[in-house]
Amino acid sequence: MQGIVMVAEQPTLHRKLIDRLAYAHDASMYRLVPEAVTRPENESDVKCLLEYAHSNGTSITFRTAGTSLSGQTVTKGIIAEVVRGWKRHEILDNGAAIQLQPGVIGGRANLYLQPYHSRIGPDPASIESAMIGG
């Protein structure tokens, strides 16, 4: 895992067991301890991380709030948390559509659409804490 340090210009990596254990579970019953946790800050960081994973045969799971009840945000590979700095939104076609980054909370997306009398499609019970990115 030392090679990952050179992937992005300023990666935020967590390889200590205690840090990885914090991401070993989501709201589901599943638990997998990832090999590393990173928080890419921009698209360039994500691109470098994807290139690293491809060339090293490891997987990346992108994660935001971790509210999944089915284990979609746990992995033995690399967890890439995309919350901080990933909260932009754009209303399109006069409210007929919305473009969201992964760190936007579902309930917040609905607030953005409220003036247009619209809502996003999914309506989970966790809408006020679930994020678009999973």
Report each predicted region and the residues it spans:
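Short acidic, glycine/serine/threonine-rich loops at helix termini
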Residues: G71-K76, N110-Y112, I132-G133
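Short, ordered loop/turn segments at secondary-structure junctions
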Residues: T64-T67, A125
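N-terminal accessory segments
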Residues: M1-S28, L32-V33, Y52-I60, A65
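N-terminal glycine-rich flavin-associated loop
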Residues: A27-I60, I78, V82-P124
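Short active-site-proximal "capping" loops at secondary-structure junctions
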Residues: S44-D45, T67-L69
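Active-site glycine-centered loops adjacent to acidic/histidine catalytic or metal-binding residues
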Residues: G66, G103, G134
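Glycine-rich anion/phosphate-binding loop at the beta-strand->alpha-helix junction
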Residues: I127-M131
